[in-house]
Amino acid sequence: MRDSRKSQMLWNNYRYRVEDDSIVIEDYCGEELDVSIPAEIEGLPVKKIAPEAFSIHGAMIERVEVPGSVTDIGDGAFKMCMSLEELVLQEGVCRIGENVLLVTAVTQLYLPTTVEKLKCPWEWGKVAIDVAQENQHYFSDGYGLYEKREDGYALVAVRAEDQRVRYTVASNTTVIERHAFEGQMYIQEVELPEGVISIEEEAFESCQALRRIVLPEGLTRICADVFRCCISLEGLELPSTLKDLGEHAVTDTYGWSPSMNGIMY
């Protein structure tokens, strides 16, 4: 467990440390329900929120506003803030760690134009993410969250709670990233556009309602466990361009086998 209190200083309800002439908030120890993180402490800009900074004493917080001075939000920063319903990110936030909203009540989140990196984005599946139109790194169509890359888009996550049964992945997508659809309970049909060349590990694992997926010519790689536990899958036609079929990509599904379910090689 993190314990850096020997190097911490206290200001109001915040324990912090100084790093490169800026402030890193290490711990919040207040009792407010509506928290506005300060942009400055003792004349220095607040740049970072440390991992799990609000996790210990934040169970009753309902709303948090992060100022534009903050560029980095650490892993699990608001984890276990069980009453948290709203997280407001101002322009300036660049990087957001993993498990930031684990065990919170947040269902919607707006990503400003400055956000450039989400760590483990598939963990955001229960949150409806709205992305600033001018953001150069991500966009959302209301269901899928995409990362913009030099060679096209990567679908990095879909909304786990969305009850739609059909989805067409955005054109210009080249990669379906690992865990992107994992555990989505409702989706039955997915169409991948021409240009998708790779489906990464566990991308559709445990999509137990998935019946049909269109795999385009040009697809070269299906990684390990991609369709594992897709027990409703009725058939799968593998394109002629496929070069790499990962371990357990279409097997190891509680007795389900390619020959029984119309897999065509």
Task: Give the positions of each predicted feature.
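Short secondary-structure subsegments characteristic of cysteine-rich extracellular domains
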Residues: 52-58
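Gram-positive cell-envelope targeting signals
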Residues: 1-5
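Structural signature of tandem-repeat unit edges
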Residues: 13-22, 29-47, 58-72, 82-95, ...
